[in-house]
Amino acid sequence: IMDRYQPDGIFSNRWAGHGICYCEHCRKNFREFSGFELPAKSDRFDRVYQKYTEWNTGRLRELWLLWDDVIRKKKATSRFIPNGFPDKVITGRLSDIVFTDHQARSGVTMPWDNGKVAKELRASIGMKPLGGIFSVGLEEQYRWKDSVQTEAEIRIWVAEGIANGMRPWFTKFSGVLYDRRWLEIVEKIYNIHYRNERYLRNIAPLARIGMVF
């Protein structure tokens, strides 16, 4: 991929897996690390699972650095971007740019939840670029990726992220557009962002004197 296309970065989705892996390699590596067998279930109060979390985070970090090193040897300005690294502090230390995959709300989630996620990441990554990935479709239990939400729903979700320091990054699945209503909505979002970007980036205070009362 790097030799042929020279991309600016490779974003790896769902790379951390789901739950505990019981393959022969994970069994062997975890046993050598901890002296334990892999835990039977995810229980954060279990001592063995706590060791598993420590080992798993360390292993993911090793893979992150390995793949990033290979990519940068092919193109120095390119990066490997892991989606959803479990430790936000490590993410802040190692990343030049961070993405949050919080595409839309579901159920009774409040609109300001997107801004809350941005604030949490700012606490660990500082002022590094933060891309807020958003989707145009429904994000309920049964996700239909060809669906399109209302303009008001999409815009308020993205606006909350932008207001708290995110840069908008939209995602759309499938190369065929069955419902084109989202195109104009996303165009509006980016036009508004472009017109106001200088205020969103240049946020260092100009004041030299502060008053405390």
Please place each PLM-identified region on the residue numbering.
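Carbohydrate-binding surfaces of carbohydrate-active enzymes
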Residues: 7, 47-213
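An active-site-proximal structural segment forming one wall of the substrate-binding cleft
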Residues: 1-17, 70, 192
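Aromatic- and acidic-residue-enriched segments that line the glycan-binding/catalytic groove
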Residues: 7, 12-43, 95
